[in-house]
Amino acid sequence: MKKIILVIFAIFFTTNLLAHSTNIDFNSKDNCTKRKSMLNGIAKLKTHKGGEIIKFNSYTGFDQRTVLIDGHLKNPIEITGYLQLPKGNDKVPIVFYTHSSGGPGDYVWNDFVYHATQNLLKNGIGVLFIDNFCPRGARATWRDQSKVPLINGAIDAMMALKVLQSHPRSNGKFGTTGHSRGGTNSFYLSDVKFTSKFIEGTKGFDAILPEAAECRMA
């Protein structure tokens, strides 16, 4: 039962698609370099202010097999996340959102992501956005998925989880979701063989909700 609590929240509170327009003046090219995460620019937008930029150590891997044999440990990298929390000081559960092949610009232009975030925050759930692309030299991977192999979204999520477990506002409950490529990332995070490479035992995410993941994963 505990495992599905965050999934129920995610389904129930992400239905409002009114009132927000994707017509936001935001230059993704100028805000995305290996040394500059797009999330730094997004955090300054009027519609997205009030969160906390979090930098954490991660790794770049080629596929799931390379992680299982610790091959990813040869390629360390610093990743940026943007954490938005409900008002107040209460400890809260946190949902990780992973962007699609469109890159972290999803967090600005995608109405669904915006309203999902607002509804979760209103109902006492924090949201962490992660930029899997800019630090690895990509803004989007529509034309070439090999620019940033799929597994890296899952690696980043697990490394972020290790950091947020000790965040003063965290109640120790975590969920993960994402659309398309981000949904595929959620499937990776359901594999205990994978998650146990980062956290001992079976303790990973408490709830997982893939959205339009790859058919081969589903």
Question: Where do the model's predicted regions map?
Answer:
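Primarily recognizes the serine-hydrolase "nucleophile elbow" in alpha/beta-hydrolase
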Residues: 151-218
